[in-house]
């Protein structure tokens, strides 16, 4: 069986990368951008950095800002209608996963009118046409949505997140500019950074992992582990390293899938609006313990990538514990809570467990699981 790997056509990396947006847009014959960016990024002038480049090059644009954290079906549908009226011929997504996921959904629906709304795109969608061309500019170091074939939209009425997978939605160009991430507060830097680490670790041990994805994931674990503390301290070196590390993780997990850390985090975002990275960070060590028997020697390599010394002389039990302890220590150092006590209500656990089991990420978990086992994992975290 062949392994597919889908990446951007082009990506730019490094401080000042956004200056090349106009060159790319003009070179591709684009005329008017539909710019997806959330209200806070507009308010604090982050979006303006990109708009200034467009205006300086004489490129037309329209801004769409009806985007919430954990974007909803309504955010997508109003975006589709706004795009139709705008006369735009391409999309620019500026932000974290929320802006990019909204833009991906809009682009796919516009290009595939047979799919009336995002609900019909849940799972692995059988679309025929590539998305409206999308240029992605991340402002967080975590989701890697600029290089993935996935997007996640919240169904508010049913309190659930829909995971949509479509290789036709990947941005054609990504601009990974650490200067666009420098305004992130410490808490957001920590949460998105732990999200990136979760991508790397889950992608490394997922059932679909193979040699090429393993290369990306181990390198991402190494980069993120050495740089997240510095990024939280807002050093330029830390920001640059995290921008790269989260992108490398995205290159991997987008092509092989994730596991039940994400399955368990998704309903927390849908029900409580919990920040995705915080949920992942809290759940990750507990699920690593649960998954350990199904991971062979991979935790030895995780521990090594996280800077643990002497792993070659450790027993299996020792290196597995060392890897999990290293994850817990990093999460603690960047200020992530240790449990879900302040988030989860015990009476909601049956709903959460069933939602997690039904989640599209669950089949990728290296260890077979059940609703009952996921229930116990949630209970252990409160």
Feature-to-residue mapping (PLM):
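An N-terminal, well-structured beta->alpha segment
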Residues: 1-64, 381
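Short glycine/serine/threonine-rich phosphate/pyrophosphate-binding segments
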Residues: 18-21, 43-46, 73-76, 99-103, ...
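N-terminal small/polar loop signature for handling phosphorylated ligands or for N-terminal nucleophile
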Residues: 42-115, 229-239
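Glycine/threonine-rich beta-strand-loop-alpha-helix active-site module
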Residues: 74-179
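Carboxylate- and glycine-rich phosphate/diphosphate-binding segment that chelates Mg2+/Mn2+
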Residues: 150-256
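Catalytic phosphate/nucleotide-handling subdomain of diverse soluble enzymes
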Residues: 267-306
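C-terminal charged capping/lid subdomain of soluble metabolic enzymes
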Residues: 299, 309-382
């Amino acid at each position: 069986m062949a392994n597919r790997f889908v990446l951007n056509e082009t990506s730019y990396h490094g401080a000042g990368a956004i200056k090349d947006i106009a060159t790319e847009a003009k070179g591709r014959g684009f005329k008017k951008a539909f710019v997806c960016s959330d209200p806070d990024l507009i308010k604090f002038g982050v979006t303006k950095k990109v708009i200034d480049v467009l205006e300086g090059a004489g490129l037309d644009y329209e801004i769409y800002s009806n985007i919430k954290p954990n974007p909803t079906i309504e955010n997508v549908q109003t975006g589709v209608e706004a795009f139709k009226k705008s006369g735009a011929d391409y999309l620019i997504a500026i932000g974290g996963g929320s802006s990019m996921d909204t833009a991906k959904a809009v682009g796919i629906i516009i290009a595939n009118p047979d799919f009336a709304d995002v609900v019909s795109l849940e799972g692995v969608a059988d679309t025929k046409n590539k998305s409206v061309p999308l240029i992605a500019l991340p402002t967080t170091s975590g989701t890697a949505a600029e290089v993935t074939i996935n997007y996640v939209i919240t169904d508010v009425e049913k309190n659930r997140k829909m995971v949509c997978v479509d290789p036709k939605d990947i941005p054609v160009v990504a601009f990974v500019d650490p200067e666009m991430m420098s305004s992130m507060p410490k808490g957001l830097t920590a949460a998105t950074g732990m999200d990136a680490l979760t991508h790397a670790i889950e992608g490394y041990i997922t059932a679909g992992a193979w040699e090429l994805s393993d290369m990306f994931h181990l390198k991402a674990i190494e980069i993120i582990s050495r740089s997240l503390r510095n990024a939280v301290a807002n050093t330029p070196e830390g920001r640059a390293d995290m921008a790269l590390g989260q992108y490398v993780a995205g290159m991997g997990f987008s092509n092989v899938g994730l596991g039940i850390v994400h399955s368990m985090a998704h309903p927390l975002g849908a029900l409580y609006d919990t920040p995705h990275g915080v949920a992942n960070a809290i759940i990750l060590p507990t699920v690593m313990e649960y998954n350990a028997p199904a991971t062979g020697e991979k935790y030895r390599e995780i521990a090594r990538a996280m800077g643990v010394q002497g792993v070659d002389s450790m027993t299996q039990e020792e290196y597995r514990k060392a890897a999990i302890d290293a994850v817990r220590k990093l999460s603690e150092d960047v200020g992530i809570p240790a449990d879900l006590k302040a988030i989860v209500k015990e009476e909601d656990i049956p709903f959460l467990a069933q939602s997690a089991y039904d989640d599209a990420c669950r089949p990728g978990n290296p260890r077979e699981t059940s609703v009952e086992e996921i229930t116990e994992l949630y209970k252990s975290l409160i």
